[in-house]
């Protein structure tokens, strides 16, 4: 049995978890509501203030989905209570970020500013002009929005200029040595 999958997920106060007969899990909390459909090869039950995930059989796919399903539901519960956030930093001369209403405007060395629309349920905060914080209840969407922002100008291999996650180590290549 999966070591992760067999652990029950405690439901904190103020969080409501519902499981429909077709394996759709709905988690409601202070930070919003999340809903996700899971495959029928796993059984999801709410009992004694905990969510318990079990599997029907023991083949490879069912074993894989057992731990995955438990981890996703645990992230849904954490998301509606605490939320998730991902921080990015902009490195480079003249590179900056600004917020205009619900749009993030990035000036990162292109001939034009790049505009990114804020998605519903995801909050984008600009601190100073070189730090961006993406917040939300859905871990997957927070990570995807942060990855989309980073993709606008990935860190350069020679100077490290671009958009990177806070704490990300960018390995720099050595430049040409040239003739002397």
From Swiss-Prot:
Record's keyword terms, sorted: Ribonucleoprotein, Ribosomal protein, RNA-binding, rRNA-binding
Gene Ontology biological process terms, A to Z: cytoplasmic translation
Source superkingdom: Bacteria
UniProt key word Nucleus: no
Pfam families for the chain: Ribosomal_L6
GO cellular component: cytosolic large ribosomal subunit
Cited InterPro entries: Ribosomal_uL6-like, Ribosomal_uL6-like_a/b-dom_sf, Ribosomal_uL6_a/b-dom, Ribosomal_uL6_bac-type
Molecular function, one GO term: structural constituent of ribosome
Keyword Acetylation on entry: no
Classification via NCBIfam families: L6_bact
Role noted for this protein: This protein binds to the 23S rRNA, and is important in its secondary structure. It is located near the subunit interface in the base of the L7/L12 stalk, and near the tRNA binding site of the peptidyltransferase center.
HAMAP family associated with the record: Ribosomal_uL6_B
The family this protein is said to belong to: Belongs to the universal ribosomal protein uL6 family.
Subunit structure: Part of the 50S ribosomal subunit.
Name of the protein: Large ribosomal subunit protein uL6
Species: Caldanaerobacter subterraneus subsp. tengcongensis (strain DSM 15242 / JCM 11007 / NBRC 100824 / MB4)
Gene symbol of the encoding locus: rplF
